[in-house]
Amino acid sequence: MPKKILFTGGGTVGHVTLNLILIPKFIKDGWEVHYIGDKNGIEHTEIEKSGLDVTFHAIATGKLRRYFSWQNLADVFKVALGLLQSLFIVAKLRPQALFSKGGFVSVPPVVAAKLLGKPVFIHESDRSMGLANKIAYKFATTVYTTFEQEDQLSKVKHLGAVTKVFKDANQIPESTQLEAVNEYFSRDLKTLLFIGGSAGAHVFNQFISDHPELKQRYNIINITGDPHLNELSSHLYRVDYVTDLYQPLMAMADLVVTRGGSNTLFELLAMAKLHLIVPLGKEASRGDQLENATYFEKRGYAKQLQEPDLTLHNFDQAMADLFEHQADYEATMLATKEIQSPDFFYDLLRADISSAIKEK
């Protein structure tokens, strides 16, 4: 009988990416892989799109809010139903372990696994834990963190960032699709790549639309999240979504303008790619992107610009400063010790799962 592992995590791409890196490794080693999530969530979309041999189990989900809302009352019942469904799934599958990447959908499966005596492993990407992982921590066997946590927590293992992105440009797959893009770009201009993520692309899209003069100063690549904006014209390439083209576009860019999600930031760090961070503010998030951006700026990896300050004048000043000190930023990024390979983390996770099973 094959070993089984349950994955959970969703709500944003960032809560799914690491799972999609780990899952093929478990499958290759003969594990039977299952995933608990929201059938209407991005986790289901990404699992389906991946084509991986994964059985998806849908549960009811309710959002965890830090503020009063009448929706909280309805969501209490959704979370309770999700917990009952998770208990049934875990009891039926009897997995060796559960791995959670966070997000509100992950809390019921984590609690269910703990109640049924299954080891629970959690990964936290941000500078501080989100509400879901703060709750899940109480039920976890081990929590792996990208950043060193300010609080000394007994279950925490500081790991560093896990990314499959690499620095060596010679290893980056060639893309014939980008040949057409290059025909519209000027070799005399710097190329900027704007990455807004699933929650933050709109501001970048609007900024580029409002300032057509940007195309006179730079080649612009804009990952929009909106197929209605798709365009290829002089010095401008707008595309709604990329998968295989993601890293070739990264390599093509001289500088990346990004939000403050930790997954993207550490990919840029792994590539030693010059970048400007425009983090989501507290009005649009819990403030984790502000913390991530400040951490990167203090380490000398990047420069940050707050969203209310995103004017053409301030943007041009930031570009000038980054390009003027490009060698310093790149040297600092190349010297980092904060990146781990997927194979390293997979081996660590497998060892920790084995240890947890033996201790039962």
Swiss-Prot record:
GO biological process, one term: regulation of cell shape
GO molecular function: undecaprenyldiphospho-muramoylpentapeptide beta-N-acetylglucosaminyltransferase activity
Associated pathway: Cell wall biogenesis; peptidoglycan biosynthesis
Localization of this protein: Cell membrane
InterPro entries per record: GlcNAc_MurG, Glyco_trans_28_C, GlycoTrans_28_N
Family that this chain belongs to: Belongs to the glycosyltransferase 28 family. MurG subfamily.
Protein name, entry field: UDP-N-acetylglucosamine--N-acetylmuramyl-(pentapeptide) pyrophosphoryl-undecaprenol N-acetylglucosamine transferase
Source species: Streptococcus pyogenes serotype M6 (strain ATCC BAA-946 / MGAS10394)
Annotated gene: murG
